[in-house]
Amino acid sequence: MENEKGEIVDLYVPRKCSATNRIIKANDHASVQISIAKVDENGRYTGENQSYALCGFIRARGESDDSLNRLCQRDGYIRNVWSASRQR
């Protein structure tokens, strides 16, 4: 599809699950996108944020909280969170 300037644009850009790297299909109505804000030492929003997309497969298995903790720990938003996957 083209816009008014004649540039090619897509109507749908597929997202990938941040936890599994699976492509999230258009009909996956259980998927969510969560934005985590970066704050300074005073707790004020710095204008930066990180978005995580979780597919319905992860949410249906009940692994979304552990996956989000793992992703936030990897990116440096949280520290020292207990994880069931590390205990095995």
Swiss-Prot record:
| A molecular function (GO) term | structural constituent of ribosome
Question: A single GO BP annotation from the record?
Answer: translation
Specify whether rRNA processing is a keyword of the entry: yes
What does the UniProt keyword field contain?
Answer: Cytoplasm, Ribonucleoprotein, Ribosomal protein, rRNA processing
Q: Where in the cell is it found?
A: Cytoplasm
Instruction: Please name the PANTHER family in this protein's record.
Output: 40S RIBOSOMAL PROTEIN S21
Entry's family note: Belongs to the eukaryotic ribosomal protein eS21 family.
On subunit structure and binding partners, the annotation says: Component of the small ribosomal subunit. Mature ribosomes consist of a small (40S) and a large (60S) subunit. The 40S subunit contains about 33 different proteins and 1 molecule of RNA (18S). The 60S subunit contains about 49 different proteins and 3 molecules of RNA (25S, 5.8S and 5S).
This chain's protein is named: Small ribosomal subunit protein eS21
Could you tell me which species this protein originates from?
Answer: Aspergillus fumigatus (strain ATCC MYA-4609 / CBS 101355 / FGSC A1100 / Af293)
Q: Which gene encodes it?
A: rps21
